[in-house]
């Protein structure tokens, strides 16, 4: 998969410039929404203006992403992590499948919340 093609042609994705571990709600709500609707992809290393910035520790970030999803979402959605390279930059792509056990809740602020995409 070409990262430029993914961010340029699809609407079933969200992007984050970096992994936020202290405030995972900012991206876990996208994981919840994808699992509760039609599935989708969350791309780490892409800025809001679609600039390709990459991640400095993509493998370490991927491990943290997996751990955070497993500890903050209930039930745990089906997802796959992959890496994409563009020149000297590396990106982490979280592909979330359409859930079979909806609703999927984000549990991180004391009260479970379910999200959807419109």
Which residue ranges define each predicted feature?
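Conserved N-terminal catalytic/coupling substructures associated with nucleotide/phosphate chemistry
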Residues: 1-118
